[in-house]
């Protein structure tokens, strides 16, 4: 493999054995592609904004003499960029402008004659725009729209699994689900009649809907039944024989063939053998006794032609009297319905008998009564309602997907079709459910991913936008029908508010619009790749059963079987598998390699769950010989959702990668294949909670996906184009672009501005640091700067810690963790948290609040950190209770005491009519002020501090832009100099020409002169651009802010808190091995090895066997080897060994392992590159062991040997306190540990006195309310068990809700009288009141 200059800095040794056929696709594409489809113009008008407009427009007036037509739309540019929106707390959105055409028709002239056309561009609200990283900024906070997994539109057949009826009979049902519109259900009842429900209302006999579709009884019978023909003879009947229909019946008479030979005697069951004999003898008719027809149903009406009397009605049971009547009337032939109990049930015939309606109108009225109970039905209303339910394009849409699923399920050839239902569709569904009831077909599996589809951002936003448009449509139609349209323009007809409101509601408060989890880069990526079955139109937690939550065979390669939350949402929220994507219908598909005649090709095809069932698919880890053929005869495969063994020749596809089945979070776990699934789930979930540490440390044992994840998450800065690093400082990187990657006539400079110390959604710190130096060559995609939790472009969520598995004085009992003081001293797990505190000055009824340093009754010391405007200085160290922003609020008029009146008379009015409402630092918080932002309403005078901040921002903007301009200008001038040198100018001559005059030289070569003029023009453009950009920036900074009504000023203070690791913090490994720190132990007391090196962390060995996450032990061994190799390299560098020796050792390391694919050609590295690589490997050689394709035990032993460590991975340790050796050898090595965002500082608090609940007068609970610890029922039992009566009394009275008792208690304590007089607890009075409210009087007797 060829490595770029920056990739050579540190190469991860990969133990993967399988060739990479496909790189992991861009991880955020599910979000970005979906939203792009929404905003891009779609010429076909099938999706996005275009589809929404086309579905609602043109809007015609009720009279038909005017209409509003849609022409086109365009999205403008957002006013503020993403960062500005976050600072100002506004939404990052673009204005939507739509070109509309109003057409007026001439009332007098022929229909369709146009009288007037007006076209105008109309503003239709703002559409929130997606940032480059797949998020939305809504009101200043980053949010993610989670994709939803919902039931695909189409038709589904199911049964109740025998749960509805007490007999346990299985009742079948069918459901037609449209994309929008009413649901149509068909279901059997226990008596086998078929019923229909519309929108889950009251059920009606299914034949009612057929009658409403203009089918008569006769039509219905002909649709669903075959006929048996009988000829009436004198004493018997002759039946037309179809031998197959007799199967399973008991012969009630002798059956003879045409020659009179006996085939079946009376009383015998007719079997398949008898039927074959009948077919052989070509018997077409059979003479049967007269009573054979009794009990069968007539297939049509039989009428006496002479009198017109109906002798036998269709679907009525035939009796002997009926036969006699028919004979008398001279009717020779009679047809009956073919019905048997085995596989041709009488379901529709039975249903017709229950059906009280006889014609279309009665059926429509019945449906109307069911849908609109209590309303008097009229013919028009009934017809209109039924028409609108399933046959109107405005009210009903199956969608493209729905039609495709519908047609495929009912075996209709084409996939395309109408969005509304047809008569034939409804009949086909009824026929299919009867087929299923008759045993000819199977029910569907609703948890199959072929029946569930993904709705992503774009589609949901489009639906909301359409909802808004439909609201507008009603208003427009009314306006078109009302006033004089000659005066009006399209702008006057459209009110954009409902559209904005619908879109805003969706992005702001929909269940699927979530506050982005921004703990670390992994949590961002997983949040964007999350697939939820909850939300509008989805499931609810309470209703979802076990089957929906379970892992389904079709999840393979589509949804991760491991990563899902624990708790009530388990299985309802899933994560997209690494290689999965959605197809044009919204179904998930996964890639497979094509296998042709047992040879594996490199052709990759994506298959959806529906298509996959038809093929035989081998796993990725099958043995393959040198020619790419499968080495074994029998191959482990998947076919039709089952795992089985098949011949190599039958295999059609093969997995592309062993990591295909799991999500990115799960594929970050090394040795995942050795962990129990439950623990792997916890491991995957806990990595998302890791807090970025002060200095990121790459994992020694990784899986090789770390770089992909870090780059795709967008937290690192990756090079857009190749070139050479020209300038680097903490906040900017400048790259001079390679000549071959330039566009014509550009400066050839890329400038990357870095994010510094910004707050994330979870209050963690986002900071980017350059990881390249001037003069380094870079190629496209190289990492130039690390973000939070990344180290040289690798995701780094935690720290590599030296751990030992052994008990230590009970300090690691029950998963507790013992850590060394050195870990805290070296700031290994120190994290920075940034809190945003806001102070809002409002206009109140009594006057406006004021931000000032002049605060009543506050000492000088409390104001020491504030400036004259009353706002804290940047850089001030503050602690709990300190004032950050001084604010006073007007007080209501109160009755003044004579003393106060006197004071007022002497010192003037202002003395006491304001109260202090300053912003203070919350208790238990201590930190440094790193930034202050002041927002002032337009028209309100800015204070001194606001003007200072504004001035600073303007200066900073000028400096930044000036430097950018200088860099770009230098690029242009440099190219101009090179041009002049190429036409014969000497260096000396160039040195004499003033800098700017280089561009106005005149040269003979015409083409070169043109080039020079182009550069000069470009220089002018750059200057104009600079001035324009600066002016825009300056205007944005100095303009007033658009604040909420009644708000005059907002001050935001950013406070950075440094949190070191301490007892009570939660830590975890990557294998679900979590624990709480129990003690920070002095370094000298920690166990140490024979060389005197103490361990950092001691873990309990009992945490491994029962949890079955053995991956952590292998990780520790591999980590020990990796670190050992790093130590060896360090020793070689310190001893200044020959480079050849160093090169040889590094080469040996990279070549270790059986069949390992990775080839690192160390020989091609220069000496400098080898030394730089070795320097970066001093801390240990990073290792990749991909999931399901990782390092084997043998390879771990080889690594340990290479590091000069015992192959067992165990060392003799000594006790740090006594110096004695421990009895047994101990497993010691390096494990990657994470500090999770469950910090003891955020959880622990203690209450002295605080607020009480209003009704019960008991102390509140929880840290936010400064609450107490609940002394609950069980705690009371404990005190009762000890017989501690007085303690118990104290707990239930003066320490809780005995109001008088607790105030008296203070006095007693102050007086030194340590006694208590318990009284009546307030909650007892509440109980009395509740009993009285039930109408039972209860009085307390005073003794």
UniProtKB/Swiss-Prot annotation:
Q: Which reaction is this enzyme known to catalyze?
A: RNA(n) + a ribonucleoside 5'-triphosphate = RNA(n+1) + diphosphate
InterPro entries the record matches:
DNA-dir_RNA_pol_bsu_ext_1_sf (IPR042107), DNA-dir_RNA_pol_bsu_external_1 (IPR019462), DNA-dir_RNA_pol_su2 (IPR015712), DNA-dir_RNAP_su2_dom (IPR007120), DNA-dir_RNAP_su2_hyb_sf (IPR037033), RNA_pol_bsu_bac (IPR010243), RNA_pol_bsu_CS (IPR007121), RNA_pol_bsu_protrusion (IPR007644)
- Any one GO biological process: DNA-templated transcription
The protein's GO terms of the molecular function aspect are: DNA binding; DNA-directed RNA polymerase activity; ribonucleoside binding
What does the subunit section of this Swiss-Prot or TrEMBL entry state? Answer: The RNAP catalytic core consists of 2 alpha, 1 beta, 1 beta' and 1 omega subunit. When a sigma factor is associated with the core the holoenzyme is formed, which can initiate transcription.
**PANTHER family (UniProt xref):** DNA-DIRECTED RNA POLYMERASE I SUBUNIT 2 (PTHR20856)
Annotated GO CC locations? DNA-directed RNA polymerase complex
Q: Which UniProt keywords apply?
A: DNA-directed RNA polymerase, Nucleotidyltransferase, Transcription, Transferase
Family matches, as Pfam families: RNA_pol_Rpb2_1 (PF04563), RNA_pol_Rpb2_2 (PF04561), RNA_pol_Rpb2_3 (PF04565), RNA_pol_Rpb2_45 (PF10385), RNA_pol_Rpb2_6 (PF00562), RNA_pol_Rpb2_7 (PF04560)
NCBIfam families registered for this protein in UniProt: PRK00405.1 (NF001616), rpoB (TIGR02013)
Q: What is the lineage of its organism?
A: Bacteria, Pseudomonadati, Pseudomonadota, Gammaproteobacteria, Alteromonadales
Q: Please indicate which superkingdom the organism of origin belongs to.
A: Bacteria
Q: Which organism is it from?
A: Shewanella frigidimarina (strain NCIMB 400)
Protein name as it appears in the record: DNA-directed RNA polymerase subunit beta
């Amino acid at each position: 493999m060829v490595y770029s200059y920056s990739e050579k800095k540190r190469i991860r040794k990969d133990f993967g054995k399988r060739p990479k056929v496909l790189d992991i696709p861009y991880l955020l594409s599910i979000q970005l592609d979906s939203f792009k489809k929404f905003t891009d113009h779609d010429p076909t008008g099938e999706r996005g904004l275009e589809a929404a407009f086309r579905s609602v427009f043109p809007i015609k007036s009720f009279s038909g003499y005017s209409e509003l037509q849609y022409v086109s739309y365009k999205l403008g540019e957002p006013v503020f960029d993403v960062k500005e929106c976050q600072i100002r707390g506004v939404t990052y959105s673009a204005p939507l402008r739509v070109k509309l055409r109003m057409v007026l028709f001439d009332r007098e002239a022929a229909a369709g004659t146009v009288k007037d056309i007006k076209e105008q561009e109309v503003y239709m609200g703002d559409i929130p725009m997606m940032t480059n990283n797949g998020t939305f900024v809504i009101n200043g906070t980053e949010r993610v729209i989670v994709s939803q997994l919902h039931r695909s539109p189409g038709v589904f057949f199911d049964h109740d699994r025998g749960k509805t009826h007490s007999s346990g009979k299985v009742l079948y049902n069918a459901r037609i689900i449209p994309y929008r519109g009413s649901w149509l259900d068909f279901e059997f009842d226990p008596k086998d009649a078929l019923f229909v429900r519309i929108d889950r209302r009251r059920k009606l006999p299914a034949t009612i809907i057929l009658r409403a579709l203009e089918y008569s009884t006769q039509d219905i019978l002909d649709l669903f039944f075959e006929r048996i023909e009988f000829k009436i003879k004198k004493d018997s009947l002759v039946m037309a024989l179809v031998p197959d229909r007799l199967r399973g019946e008991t012969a009630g008479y002798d059956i003879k063939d045409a020659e009179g030979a006996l085939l079946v005697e009376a009383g015998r069951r007719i079997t398949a053998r008898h039927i074959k004999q009948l077919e052989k003898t070509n018997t077409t008719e059979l003479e049967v006794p007269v009573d054979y027809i009794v009990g069968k149903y007539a297939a049509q009406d039989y009428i006496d032609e002479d009198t017109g009397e109906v002798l036998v009605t269709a679907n009525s049971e035939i009796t002997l009297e009926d036969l006699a009547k028919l004979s008398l009337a001279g009717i020779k032939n009679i047809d009956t319905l073919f019905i048997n109990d085995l596989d041709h049930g009488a379901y529709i015939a039975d249903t017709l008998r229950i059906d009280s309606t006889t014609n279309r109108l009665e059926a429509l009225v019945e449906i109307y009564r069911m849908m609109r109970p209590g309303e008097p039905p009229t013919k028009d209303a009934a017809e209109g309602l039924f028409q609108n339910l399933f046959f109107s394009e405005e009210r009903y849409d199956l969608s493209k997907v729905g039609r495709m699923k519908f047609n495929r399920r009912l075996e209709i050839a084409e996939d395309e079709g109408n969005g509304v239902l047809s008569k034939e569709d409804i009949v086909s569904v009824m026929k299919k459910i009867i087929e299923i009831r008759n045993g000819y077909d199977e029910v569907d599996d609703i948890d199959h991913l072929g029946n569930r589809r993904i709705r992503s951002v774009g589609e949901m936003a489009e639906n909301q936008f359409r909802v808004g448009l439909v609201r507008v449509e009603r208003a427009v139609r009314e306006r078109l029908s009302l006033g004089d349209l000659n005066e009006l323009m399209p702008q006057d007809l459209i009110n954009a508010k409902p559209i904005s409101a619908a879109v805003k509601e969706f992005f702001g408060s929909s269940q699927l619009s979530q506050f982005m989890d921004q703990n670390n880069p992994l949590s961002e990526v997983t949040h964007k790749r999350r697939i939820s079955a909850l939300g509008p139109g989805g499931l609810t937690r309470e209703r979802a059963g076990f089957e929906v939550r379970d892992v389904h065979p079709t999840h393979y390669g589509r949804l991760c079987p491991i990563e899902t939350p624990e708790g009530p949402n388990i299985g309802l929220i899933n994560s997209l598998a690494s290689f999965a994507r959605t197809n044009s219908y919204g179904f998930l598909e996964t890639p497979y390699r094509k296998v042709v005649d047992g040879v594996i090709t490199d052709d990759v095809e994506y298959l959806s769950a529906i298509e996959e069932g038809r093929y035989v698919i081998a796993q990725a880890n099958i043995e393959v010989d040198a020619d790419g053929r499968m080495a074994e005869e029998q191959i482990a495969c998947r076919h039709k959702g089952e795992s089985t063994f098949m011949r190599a020749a039958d295999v059609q596809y093969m997995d592309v990668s062993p990591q295909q089945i799991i999500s990115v979070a799960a594929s970050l776990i090394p040795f995942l294949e050795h962990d129990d699934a439950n623990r792997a789930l916890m491991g995957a979930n806990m990595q998302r909670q890791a807090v970025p540490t002060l200095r990121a440390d790459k994992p020694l044992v990784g899986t090789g996906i770390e770089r992909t994840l870090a780059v795709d998450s967008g937290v690192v800065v990756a090079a857009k184009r190749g070139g050479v690093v020209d300038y680097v400082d903490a906040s900017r990187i400048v790259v001079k672009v390679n000549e071959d990657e330039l566009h014509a006539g550009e400066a050839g400079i890329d400038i990357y501005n870095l994010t510094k110390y910004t707050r994330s959604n979870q209050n963690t710190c986002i900071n980017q640091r350059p990881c390249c130096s001037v003069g380094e060559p870079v190629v496209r995609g190289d990492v130039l700067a690390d973000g939070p939790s990344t180290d040289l472009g690798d995701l780094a969520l935690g720290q590599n810690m030296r751990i030992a598995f052994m008990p230590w004085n009970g300090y690691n009992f029950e998963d507790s963790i013992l850590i060394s003081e050195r870990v805290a001293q070296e700031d290994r797990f120190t994290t920075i948290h940034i809190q945003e505190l806001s102070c809002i000055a409002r206009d109140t009824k009594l006057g406006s609040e004021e931000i000032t340093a002049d605060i009543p009754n506050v000492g000088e010391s409390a104001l020491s950190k504030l400036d004259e405007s009353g706002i804290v200085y940047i850089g001030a160290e503050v602690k709990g209770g300190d004032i950050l922003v001084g604010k006073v609020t007007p007080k209501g008029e109160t009755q003044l005491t004579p003393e106060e009146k006197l004071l007022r008379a002497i010192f003037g009015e202002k003395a006491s009519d304001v109260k202090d409402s300053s912003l203070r630092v919350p208790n238990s918080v201590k930190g440094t002020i790193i930034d202050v932002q002041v927002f002032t309403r337009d028209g309100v005078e800015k204070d001194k501090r606001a003007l200072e901040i504004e001035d600073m921002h303007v200066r900073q903007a000028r400096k930044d832009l000036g430097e950018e301009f200088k860099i770009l200008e230098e690029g242009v001038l440099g190219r101009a100099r090179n041009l002049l040198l190429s036409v014969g100018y000497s260096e000396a001559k160039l040195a004499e020409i003033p800098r700017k005059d280089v561009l106005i030289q005149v040269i003979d070569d015409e083409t070169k002169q043109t080039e020079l003029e182009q550069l000069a023009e470009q220089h002018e453009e750059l200057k104009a651009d600079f001035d324009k950009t600066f002016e825009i920036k300056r205007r944005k900074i100095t303009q007033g802010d658009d604040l909420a009504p009644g708000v005059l000023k907002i001050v935001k203070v950013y406070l950075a808190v440094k949190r070191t690791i301490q007892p009570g913090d939660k830590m975890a490994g990557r294998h679900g091995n979590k624990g709480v720190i129990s003690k920070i132990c002095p370094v000298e007391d920690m166990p140490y090895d024979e060389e005197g090196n103490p361990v950092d962390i001691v873990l309990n060995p009992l945490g491994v066997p029962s949890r079955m996450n053995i991956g952590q032990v292998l990780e520790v061994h591999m980590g020990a080897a990796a670190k050992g190799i790093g130590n060896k390299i360090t020793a070689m560098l310190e001893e200044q060994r020959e480079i050849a020796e160093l090169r040889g050792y590094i080469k040996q390391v990279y070549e270790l392992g059986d069949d390992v694919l990775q080839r690192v050609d160390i020989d091609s590295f220069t000496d400098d590159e080898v030394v730089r690589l070795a320097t970066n490997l001093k801390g240990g050689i990073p290792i990749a062991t991909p999931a399901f394709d990782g390092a084997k035990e043998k390879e771990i032993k080889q690594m340990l040997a290479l590091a000069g460590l015992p192959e067992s991975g165990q060392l003799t340790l000594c006790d740090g306190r006594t110096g004695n050796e421990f009895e047994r050898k101990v497993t010691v090595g390096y494990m990657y540990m994470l500090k999770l965002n469950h910090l003891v500082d955020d959880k622990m608090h203690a209450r002295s006195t605080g607020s009480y609940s209003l009704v019960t007068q008991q102390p509140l609970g929880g840290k936010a309310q400064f609450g107490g610890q609940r002394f609950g029922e069980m705690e009371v039992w404990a005190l009762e068990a000890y017989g501690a009566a007085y303690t118990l009394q104290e707990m239930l009275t003066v320490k809780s809700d005995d109001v008088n008792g607790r105030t008296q208690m203070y006095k007693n304590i102050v007086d030194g009288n340590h006694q208590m007089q318990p009284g009546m607890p307030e909650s007892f009075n509440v109980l009395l009141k509740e009993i009285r409210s039930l109408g039972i009087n209860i009085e307390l007797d005073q003794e």
